[in-house]
């Protein structure tokens, strides 16, 4: 209806919009990547990073433990804040891509800031990207790959995770790529 969700009281939201807690309840016992949307171009942009504080507070209150979560965001400041608040919860930087001449410096910066993964756009990922991340101790989880042949290629290169709209296809590709 055009309202900005972050500016609406929960009691006024439609029933089909859930809280983070409710969404996480639905995901038990899965490992969950919580993506924080905090883009300066969005009407609900939060320069104070209180969204990071609220997300960490929600995850810490839950009984499952910190190793069940990974927090990702396109905004480095957001994941940096999450890392400052709770270093035991894994964090990852989402990116469309990084200039080749800056790539190693970016990876070193992610490691220095305590982040555990890079989440690059699927068209940015190469064997060299994955190898460089792994050499820095970072996992690589790409987004959004729905093409089975590209999934197979990424798996053969050692990708750690694939975000997809077709999880059934991804599981088939993974199972075919893995020796029995």
Where are the predicted features?
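Alpha-helical scaffolding within the catalytic cores
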Residues: 17-23, 76, 101-105, 126
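C-terminal active-site rim and adjoining tail of enzyme catalytic domains
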Residues: 92-180
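Charged helix-capping and loop-helix junction motifs
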Residues: 47-54, 106-107
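Structural detector of well-ordered beta-strand residues that form the stable sheet scaffold
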Residues: 33, 70-72, 92, 141
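Conserved, mostly hydrophobic/aromatic
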Residues: 13, 23, 34, 75, ...
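Acidic (Asp/Glu)-rich catalytic clusters
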Residues: 22-32, 57-65, 80-86, 107-114, ...
């Amino acid at each position: 209806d055009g309202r900005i969700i972050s500016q609406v009281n929960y009691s006024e939201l439609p029933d089909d919009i859930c809280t983070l807690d409710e969404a996480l309840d639905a995901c038990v016992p899965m490992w969950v990547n919580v993506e924080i949307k905090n883009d300066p171009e969005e009407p609900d942009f939060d320069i104070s990073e209180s969204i990071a504080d609220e997300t960490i507070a929600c995850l810490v209150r839950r009984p499952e433990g910190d190793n069940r979560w990974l927090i990702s965001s396109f905004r480095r400041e957001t994941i940096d804040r999450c890392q400052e608040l709770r270093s035991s919860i894994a964090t990852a930087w989402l990116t469309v891509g990084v200039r080749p001449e800056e790539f190693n410096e970016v990876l070193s910066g992610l490691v220095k800031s305590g982040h555990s993964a890079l989440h690059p756009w699927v068209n940015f990922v190469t064997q060299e990207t994955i190898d460089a991340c792994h050499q820095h101790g970072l996992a690589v989880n790409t987004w959004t790959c729905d093409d089975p042949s590209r999934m197979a290629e990424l798996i053969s290169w050692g990708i750690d995770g694939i975000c997809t709209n077709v999880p059934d296809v991804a599981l088939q590709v993974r199972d075919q790529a893995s020796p029995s």
